[in-house]
């Protein structure tokens, strides 16, 4: 039993064979229909010329009527042949028979012979379209000769009494010339139009192929961007980020060399941190910042160059010496500049390629920024834990050196007074007075310590009043050092509770360090409202100062230094701190914190 699928396939094949058999005869079938229109016109003309003798058909029909009916029979036969594949060759020259029949009817048309002239245009137009230019020209000449011969033969053989004038000959020549050139002109016009149409079709195909190629390239680029986004979004390793950037850039722009320049840590210096297709010795090479590199790093968009003359630092790299063009893409996020991505090629870079490279670089910048934030967060966490541990140790030392020893003295004094009461009550009273003094002093020290840890009045009376009371307590410990508090336009300043507490701790640590280490005559604490968003606090002394670079190195070794922790704590509350110190010229610490709107 035949399956429906096989039956459908067989029917489709049969239909395709039928179409292939009919399709070559499309022009001939149309011309067969046009021939019947021509026959109708000839019938009307013949009926007019024979005064109604065309129909009904009798035994005494004239030659014009006979030729017409022969032509009708011819048309019937060739109409059938137009649908048969094997007769295609014969059908293609059937227009010659049309010319012959029209010429015979012209010969027998009598005085109205001119009326047959337009009917030649139907077969001649067919010849112009279906045949070559040379064949259509020969067909036109044949039709012209046949028409002129029929016209002259009728005048000479059938109507010799009708004399031809010069005007008749001129008119005949014009009609003959028209018949001769019409197919040639029509054929040329048709061929030129066909060539134009072919060119348009070819151009449309080229445009379609180009559009398809661009669509495929765009699809590949989107896939690359997706892969980059997926890879970069799942890693916090900046090395993997930059490796992915180099690999995916190679797919978009087959570059000669890809180079990532990062800061070396030295002023105005970069180094080759990563690269692809690098020349020997280029990796880790240090480059001084020239004018061109500085401008490229400051730019917000990619810079395309065709010469390295303005980039003497890049000329040192062997990887770039044979390259003709390069794209310089800054790797920056906000105010932070990570480095420069250089893509060097042997060919000119297109705008689309540069835009895609910039898109890849932007993905990499986001990943780099995230990696940096994660790194900074870990560093801040370690520093905060270290600072917390340091504060605990400091608190333990302060408690041990102050209240703990005082309590031990009080305990010993109390035991001594108990024994002394039995032997010398008067002396015991004196000892009780001293014990009371020690207890009061210890109570003051404990209160001061609690005040320094978290003054409750900070929440009720504000920063300035709290600082005034704190500095009053501190002046007793400061010896000959004068502590001056100044405030400018800060009465209505409101800070968040966390910001206010952090700022108090930063001021406290700065002043305490100045008292302990600066050996200063004066310490100034100045508060000033800069604008509606920022409060500035300056802690300045005229002490011995210190070498900031040396302290930084010491800080890196020890992992702890109070003054340098101030900037970290300021950034935690949305501010920043600046430390400026010179040996022999004192120290100035400037803290900026946000004002609560």
Swiss-Prot record:
Record keyword Ribosomal protein present: no
GO MF term set: phosphorelay sensor kinase activity; protein dimerization activity; protein kinase activity
Listed EC numbers: 2.7.13.-
Principal location class: membrane
Entry-linked SUPFAM superfamilies: ATPase domain of HSP90 chaperone/DNA topoisomerase II/histidine kinase (SSF55874), GAF domain-like (SSF55781)
Any one GO CC term of the record: plasma membrane
Segments traversing the membrane: 37-57, 67-87, 109-129, 134-154, 162-182
Top-rank taxon, per record: Bacteria
Subcellular locations according to the entry: Cell membrane
Segments forming domain Histidine kinase: 393-597
UniProt keywords, alphabetically: Cell membrane, Kinase, Membrane, Transferase, Transmembrane, Transmembrane helix, Two-component regulatory system
InterPro entries: GAF (IPR003018), GAF-like_dom_sf (IPR029016), HATPase_C_sf (IPR036890), His_kinase_dom (IPR005467), Sensor_HK_TwoCompSys (IPR050482), Sig_transdc_His_kin_sub3_dim/P (IPR011712)
Membrane topology (UniProt): Multi-pass membrane protein
Pfam families the UniProt entry points to: GAF_3, HATPase_c, HisKA_3
Protein name: Uncharacterized sensor-like histidine kinase Caur_0899
